[in-house]
């Protein structure tokens, strides 16, 4: 009953908000909301010093009974995702707010270790995780690559803003940018320790997930679901993460004039094109295993995959992946322009956990993403960026207009149109909001459009 009521509330909210603001007003509201997510703010008034200026990933209202009665709220209310901070850097830069972008970069400086290691998420009200407490902490190389790429984006945009050529000499002549380039190299060097070097391995050239993972487990005795923490390297290879990493290594190689990064990026590119593209699916696979592909259908591997293929000069794959992304489209109300894209097209909602699927969907324990209607604004905006790069500006405008239906009164864009415990939340999110800003600003600013994930 809870899920039905929550879903109805969200649908009522969406229907009541659609088309309330002009595009410019919607972007400005999103920007103001993003600024309000930086700590210190009204939620975390006294963040620990090393976490100052990070952004809170979600807008979680303490006064909302759904949060107040959630036992996990005390642990997640101050949570700041590395990926979200990377997006915030890019969004702030696209808004011309270099000060806030640099504040986040400085915070990352305070939290990286001497080997270039970054955690996937950070608390802001206390020091978890740090060298004294890494329990339940995970690290993802894809998120670290996003952080590195965002810093490089800042460097390049800052030089452009000062009418300077984007090259190594101009970076080294600026003390701030020189430090930031060194930070990027530190991050890249750590990521490359995870690149598969065995040429006999089907994953050769690709980068594995990272360190530690969480697994959902159904407790039959307590009739409940909980997360289990598993320590050690994460052996899977995410194609989406490797696409992120390619753009980071490629741009770092260009700016730093470093052949090590150039060779690593080239190897990664060739591995993605050879091992990750699926001709039958007409998109990139979700992952690559030791002997075969993980062929689950993921939206990012169609939309971001299209951006990657276009960047490396394979327009045929770019167009095919872009066209495939339309299969993920959901229209909830054509008359009111309520539509978007779902994150997956195949697999159980709780993949490979049939007992967990049964717990959450007792009437339909085999429910899969194919039949599960949920709009994902962040992913929908990824499709919009792919459309923008391929010259379909009308589609970009339409998606932006549709995403305004998911903008909360506070200005934040909902993470998803319905709750899926442990996976998707209906709370306003940095991810959705930052992507909204990035697409809108890139639509009107050709320099930003070309700078972000540009062509080789």
Question: Where are the model-predicted features located?
Answer:
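Surface-exposed substrate-engagement region within the catalytic domains
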Residues: 375-380, 384-407
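Extended ligand-binding clefts on enzyme/binding-domain cores
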Residues: 22-71, 79-83, 110, 116-142, ...
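Bacterial N-terminal signal peptides
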Residues: 6-16
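"A position-specific structural signal for the A-helix of alpha-solenoid helical repeats
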Residues: 87, 91, 150, 248-251, ...
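N-terminal secretory signal peptides that target proteins for export/translocation
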Residues: 1-3
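Alpha-helical support elements that line or immediately flank enzyme active sites
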Residues: 85-101, 108, 302-309, 386-390, ...
């Amino acid at each position: 009953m809870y899920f039905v009521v929550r879903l109805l509330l969200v649908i009522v909210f969406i229907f009541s908000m659609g088309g309330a603001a002009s595009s410019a007003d919607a972007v400005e509201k999103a920007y103001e909301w993003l600024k309000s997510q930086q700590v210190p703010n009204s939620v975390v008034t006294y963040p620990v010093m090393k976490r100052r200026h990070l952004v809170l990933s979600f807008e979680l209202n303490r006064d909302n009974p759904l949060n107040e009665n959630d036992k996990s709220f005390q642990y997640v209310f101050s949570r700041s995702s590395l990926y979200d901070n990377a997006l915030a850097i890019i969004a702030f830069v696209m808004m011309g707010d270099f000060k806030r972008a640099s504040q986040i970069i400085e915070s990352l400086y305070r939290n990286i270790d001497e080997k270039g290691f970054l955690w996937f998420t950070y608390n802001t009200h206390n020091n978890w995780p740090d060298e004294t407490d890494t329990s339940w902490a995970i690290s993802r190389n894809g998120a670290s690559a996003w952080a590195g790429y965002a810093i490089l984006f800042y460097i390049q945009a800052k030089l452009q803003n000062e009418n300077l050529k984007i090259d190594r000499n101009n970076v080294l002549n600026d003390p701030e940018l020189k430090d930031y380039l060194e930070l990027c190299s530190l991050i890249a060097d750590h990521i490359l320790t995870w690149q598969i070097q065995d040429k006999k391995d089907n994953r050769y050239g690709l980068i594995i997930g990272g360190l530690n993972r969480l697994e959902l487990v159904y407790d039959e005795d307590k009739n409940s679901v909980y997360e289990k923490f598993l320590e050690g390297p994460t052996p899977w290879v995410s194609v989406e993460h490797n696409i992120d990493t390619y753009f980071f290594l490629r741009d770092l190689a260009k700016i730093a004039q470093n052949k090590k990064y150039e060779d690593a990026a080239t190897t990664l590119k060739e591995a993605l094109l050879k091992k990750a593209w699926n001709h039958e699916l007409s998109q990139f696979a979700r992952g690559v295993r030791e002997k075969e592909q993980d062929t689950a259908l993921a939206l990012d591997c169609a939309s971001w995959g299209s951006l990657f293929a276009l960047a490396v000069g394979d327009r045929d794959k770019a167009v095919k992946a872009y066209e495939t992304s339309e299969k993920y489209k959901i229209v909830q109300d054509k008359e009111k322009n309520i539509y978007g894209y779902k994150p997956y097209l195949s697999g159980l909602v709780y993949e490979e956990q049939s007992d967990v699927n049964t717990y959450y969907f007792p009437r339909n324990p085999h429910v899969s993403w194919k039949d599960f209607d949920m709009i994902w604004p962040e992913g929908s905006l990824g499709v919009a960026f792919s459309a923008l790069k391929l010259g379909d500006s009308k589609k970009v405008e339409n998606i932006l207009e549709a995403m305004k239906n998911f903008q909360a009164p506070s200005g934040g864009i909902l993470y998803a149109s319905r709750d899926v415990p442990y996976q998707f939340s209906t709370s306003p999110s940095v991810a959705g909001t930052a992507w909204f800003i990035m697409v809108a600003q890139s639509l009107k600013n050709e320099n930003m459009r070309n700078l972000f994930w540009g062509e080789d």
